[in-house]
Amino acid sequence: MNLNEKRRDVARDICRSYGITLSVDALHAFADILEPFKVLKGHRLVDEGQVCNYTYYVERGLVLQYYRKNNVSVTEHISHEGDMVICIESFFLREPSKIVVAMLEPSVVFGI
C-alpha cells in the first residue's frame, strides 16, 4: 500500500469513528494533510515547553500524556489505536505545552 492509499484509509477511519461523512473530494483533501510519523518507544511527540503543532491520530501503539508536579510525573491520559491525542491548550492558544506526549511502545501516528 502506498502512502496516499494509507492516508486515505486513515482519513476514512477517523471520519467513521466520529460519524462524519465526506465527499470523495473532501476525503482526499483531508487525507492529503495527514502527516505520518513512525516513532520509537520513548520518543516525545511534544515535550514540555514546546508548542503542540498537531492533533495526532494513533494508528498503532500506545501514547502517554503526562505533566510534572513537584518533580513527580502525573499521568494525564493514555491513548491507543484509534484515539486522538492533543495538547489542547498549547495547540489552540499557541503556547508552550505543560504536557508531554511520549510513546510507550513503537507507534505509528498521523498528524493533522
Locations of regions flagged by a protein language model:
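Cytosolic regulatory regions built on CNB/CRP/Popeye-like sensor folds
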Residues: 1-112
